[in-house]
Amino acid sequence: MGGWSIALHGGAGDIPFSLPPERRQPREEGLRHCLQIGVEALKSQKPPLDVVELVVRELENIQHFNAGIGSVLTNSGTVEMEASIMDGKTMKCGAVSGLSTVLNPISLARLVMDKTPHIYLAFQGAQDFAKQQGVETVDSSHFITAENVERLKLAIEANRVQVDYSQYNYPQPAQDDAEKELPLANGDSQIGTVGCVAVDSHGNLASATSTGGLVNKMVGRIGDTPLIGAGTYANELCAVSATGKGEAIISATVARDVAALMEFKGLSLKEAADYVVHERTPKGTVGLIAVSAAGEIAMPFNTTGMFRASATEDGYSEIAIWPTT
């Protein structure tokens, strides 16, 4: 059995190589900060379930990601956040969606898992449960930032569900032939969704994912993030957190398929993750992070980029956005 491993993501999508430093660096610093928190927690023997909740809570508190405080707006200018969490050892899980006042959706998902006979609570029922549990809530206006209002305005003007990085607020240079081979920016990428997967030295696994969804989404739209087996999954073999176009992730049951290929086909983590991302989902739509019980890490994506970070007990660590050779 290998030692502990951890991986986290800050979303996959159409991230141009020309992304300005003022947009790139805060996300990289956020990933670095949260990775360190996760590493220290694993070193101190915290269970992976606690680790992934802790890391995703921290990611939700960083406005540069599309989760928690940074959540994007619906077509009515409101926030509807969603999250899920799963423990690989027990297969217990919890999920929430339609949240507009809960500061840290991932912790409410954990409470659904721990304190109710259910797996999934949504909208008013979830918010009532949050009040019952004494979860920290704020006025919904807390989540309405100037940047997200502007992003929604651009999306409405363009009559599209999402404005991607390449169209947001700065000039985009003409593409050369190499760039034209990359997945096209189609406005459907799910920018900034956050997730974390972890395994301890005993092979215990957990996964957590949180998001604000898609810019200009219809009120009531639910994506892959709170759906166990789509955006989040963990069992005794692996833990997976997905990001990208939610509808593509749902229809391909991305997270569960990685585990199923390992279980029923005997594929390695990397083989299973690569197959799901590159063979079973449309180009330009999906990325994921995954760890195995043996401590392996996989972080494939078929978008132009994915904000990601990882570390292992043997000292390896990585923070990256675009493909690495």
Swiss-Prot record:
The active site is at residue 193. Cleaved into an alpha and beta chain by autocatalysis; this activates the enzyme. The N-terminal residue of the beta subunit is responsible for the nucleophile hydrolase activity. One of its GO terms (molecular function) is beta-aspartyl-peptidase activity. It catalyses: Cleavage of a beta-linked Asp residue from the N-terminus of a polypeptide. The record marks 192-193 as: Cleavage. Developing seeds. Substrate binds at residues 221-224, 243-246. Keywords: Autocatalytic cleavage, Hydrolase, Protease. Pfam families: Asparaginase_2. GO terms for biological process: proteolysis. Its EC number is 3.4.19.5. Heterotetramer of two alpha and two beta chains arranged as a dimer of alpha/beta heterodimers. Acts in asparagine catabolism but also in the final steps of protein degradation via hydrolysis of a range of isoaspartyl dipeptides. Belongs to the Ntn-hydrolase family. This is Isoaspartyl peptidase/L-asparaginase. It comes from Lupinus angustifolius.
